[in-house]
């Protein structure tokens, strides 16, 4: 029940039209392969967006990943993330043991000056599931990422035919939810 789940997260979804709109959106996304049962943070972000409560901490302008032996990487990966925060463009390179680790390093580096909480975020689990068996390397995949800041742990989902793009989607949501949660905790301590 969407109304019950929304209530558990602190959102009043008693308006039948609003609840129906969110339910339809979730059904559309589930038909594409998304699953929110194990991705509460992505569910909450979807509800916030539907209610017009989504916070825009940063805008992604561009990202790119290299992996393998090219450019002297010796099997490691390198990522460039270019984002806009409060009108300022920030571009950072991250290196890591795989494409997602490199993207995580680059995004953390780009965010931490404006949002110090981002430096506390740690990716603790990463799961990939093939959704349409038999399609081989062009299969649709679902990615779940668990992230923690040492206080809370949250999970986000990404879906697509490109495992790196699906991973980026889940990572992006993890940072958005984490920054929102960190801001809420700071506000409640100040209040």
Model-derived features: where do they sit?
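Terminal or standalone catalytic/regulatory effector modules within metabolic enzymes
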Residues: 1-191
């Amino acid at each position: 029940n969407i109304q019950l789940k929304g209530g558990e997260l602190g959102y009043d979804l008693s308006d039948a039209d609003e609840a129906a709109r969110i339910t339809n959106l979730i059904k559309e996304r589930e038909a594409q392969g998304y699953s929110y049962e194990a991705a509460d943070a992505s569910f909450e972000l979807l509800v916030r967006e539907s209610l017009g409560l989504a916070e825009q901490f940063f805008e992604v302008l561009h990202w790119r990943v290299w992996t393998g032996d090219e450019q002297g990487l010796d099997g490691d990966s390198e990522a460039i993330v270019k984002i806009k925060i409060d009108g300022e463009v920030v571009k950072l390179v991250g290196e890591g043991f795989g494409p997602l680790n490199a993207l995580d390093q680059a995004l953390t580096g780009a965010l931490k000056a404006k949002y110090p909480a981002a430096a506390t975020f740690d990716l603790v689990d990463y799961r990939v599931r093939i959704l349409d068996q038999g399609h081989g390397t062009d299969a649709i995949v679902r990615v779940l990422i668990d992230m923690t800041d040492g206080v809370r742990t949250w999970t986000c989902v990404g879906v697509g035919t490109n495992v790196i793009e699906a991973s980026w989607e889940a990572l992006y949501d993890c940072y958005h939810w984490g920054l929102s949660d960190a801001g809420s905790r700071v506000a409640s301590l100040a209040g």
